[in-house]
Amino acid sequence: MNKNDFKDFQNYLIDKKHFSSNTVNSYERDLRKLFIYLDSNGYDCDDIRSWLTEVCINNYMEYLRDNKYSAATLARTVSTVHVYSEYLFDKNIIKDKPQIDIKITKDAEHDLVIFTRYEIAQILDIDTLTLNDFRDKAIFELSYSIGIKPTECINLEMKDVNLEIGYIKYRKQDSYRTVALNTESIEAIRNYLDALKKHKVPISEESKLFLNHDGEGISRQGYWKIFKKRQKELELTKELNTMNFRNSLAVHLLEDNVPIQDVQEILGLKNIHSLKSYIKSLKKTKAIKRMFSNHPRKAMK
């Protein structure tokens, strides 16, 4: 794959998939890493059918595991391979989209980090003293309302929010999603918008919803720092990041017996299979609660 091929793949990720620049760079790095592996193991990278196979890709995954790559890297590599296959198919470089079952073995899996409802309440309880406080409060409430992902959140524009009816519309890959908001997130966003007006921040319908101190849309790094700052303020032992926050919402919805299909819709998941890890975490939590509720020590009091 030459320089022009990589550029074409990058353009595909941006124009067709609407990925952020950070995601595009990650996919390109993963693909280059794969090609280095293929070349060092005697594969001809230009002969796509020789290596875009279930056996070869799973051998590569085993190589990554042996070299202690994280579960997150393995999962992203799986996504990269699938998206690259779609790209090759869409560009008619291959005639059939390969059906590759990529296996991530259990030793690469890890338990989800789930915040309790009390911890979530603490995180959401932000003293709104400054403009950034109002912004951060709105971001956390929105994240816990619908489990919105970082790229989706930072790309929101003022015109994407309808607080009268109570919904937001945002781009998800090559389509738009319209999602209803809960009362708390509507109130938090409305208070944030009022604070923007009070501070005379110039905004328009096309302005980004969440702004930095320069009045520009916050970056992915800035978004990440908001979560790190809150973790430090509360001295949380669990890592507070966007994924753990989203995972917590999913498990709490399932705990409240929200139908699986509704949880899938709220989180914007493509299929119910994506909920497997959440259901597994919920079962583990319930098992622990049962164990302690029936523990013999309780009868000794």
What do these predicted ranges mean?
Residues 1-301:
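Conserved catalytic core of the tyrosine transesterase superfamily
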